[in-house]
Amino acid sequence: MIQTDAFECKYIIKGSIEYQIEKEIFTLHEGDTLFFDGRARHRLKNIGATEALILAFYLF
């Protein structure tokens, strides 16, 4: 798991992603957006059969 010193915004351009933030798991698909405090421990995993593409914003 990782942490950053920023708020993070992730937009799923293509594919399916599983995002774990602390103990909570979110399943994201094309067109979904996730916004969270990057100081929380988090990780992501590609759960689709194809490559995933994510646009990430870090707000310091």
Where are the regions that the model predicts?
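Short histidine-centered beta-strand/loop micro-motifs
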Residues: 1-4, 45-47
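Short, conserved beta-strand element in jelly-roll/cupin
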Residues: 2-19
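Short acidic-glycine-tyrosine-enriched beta hairpin
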Residues: 22-37
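Ligand-binding loop in jelly-roll beta-barrel domains
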Residues: 29, 38-60
